Amino acid sequence: MNYQVLLYYKYTTIDDPEQFAQDHLAFCKAHHLKGRILVSTEGINGTLSGTKEETEQYMAHMHADERFKDMVFKIDEAEGHAFKKMHVRPRKEIVALDLEEDVDPRHTTGQYLSPVEFRKALEDDDTVIIDARNDYEFDLGHFRGAIRPNITRFRDLPDWIKENKALFADKKVVTYCTGGIRCEKFSGWLLKEGFEDVAQLHGGIATYGKDPETKGQYWDGKMYVFDDRISVDINQVEKTIIGKDWFDGKPCERYINCANPECNKQILVSEENEAKYLGACSYDCAKHERNRYVQANNISGNEWQQRLTNFDDLHQHA
């Protein structure tokens, strides 16, 4: 495989995010890179793909900048680009938590745990493990025994914690996320909220899965990623599927977006059920006039109506 996918972040001061974003986009395009990068006064958060040569040049370019000289890149091999376009966007935050009083992870953050230390935490009954990701990420794969916050956006996590604080009272709290960036700020917020013993998986799930000692142990399912790959394997010790098909509940690790462009809900569904239910999550979405699955597959009006009756069968067996 001649391509690489990079995942990285760095909390550091960027004085002019707008100008930085403009210059950075030009550099990335000149090196034929594709991906999504967010920049703000608090730092950079990115994931991109390119050939090995181009991604190596990118990493060297970043490490030559004093602000990013020690930035860690998580690297996956790939057969081609994992993105269709290149975006570099200035933002208020590089990860949106939208706190009234912001947290600076450079000054306030939870204790870093290595993969081996995190594995010990997973084995400790007195430690609470919180998944800091969204519900659809958790449903595809997560660490065994981790708590699933019922959220669809990271910014909703603090409110969920406040509502469920009794679950974590007087216990050691350890949190994890994909690459570590969300936990940097979230664990700092937990400390400010009065939680005394707070730690985080340093480098996130991506680092844990590549560690030669842990080899992804205790991870069930796949890890959701925000690129064209959709998911990647983590556990090198044992393979389990925990995702369930939206319609029939059978084991499934295939995510699609609902074919209704006004819905776009992510659901786990087999190719067979995607066709059967017109790529939609519900009857209302399946009959939507702009159904993308219907358009992409040139389904006739009669066939469309016929497949809509599959939802009647679904409700009868529910």
Curated annotation (Swiss-Prot):
Gene (UniProt): trhO
One GO biological process term: tRNA modification
The organism's place on the tree of life at top rank: Bacteria
Disulfide bond sites: none
Coiled-coil regions, chain positions: none
This protein's name: tRNA uridine(34) hydroxylase
Family under the similarity heading: Belongs to the TrhO family.
Annotated Gene3D superfamilies: 3.30.70.100, Rhodanese-like domain
Keyword Hydrolase belongs to the record: no
One example GO MF annotation: oxidoreductase activity, acting on paired donors, with incorporation or reduction of molecular oxygen
HAMAP family: TrhO (MF_00469)
Keywords, alphabetical: Oxidoreductase, tRNA processing
Entries under Pfam families matching the protein: Rhodanese, Rhodanese_C, UPF0176_N
Catalyses which reaction(s): uridine(34) in tRNA + AH2 + O2 = 5-hydroxyuridine(34) in tRNA + A + H2O
Catalytic site: 177 (cysteine persulfide intermediate)
Described purpose of this protein according to its UniProt entry: Catalyzes oxygen-dependent 5-hydroxyuridine (ho5U) modification at position 34 in tRNAs.
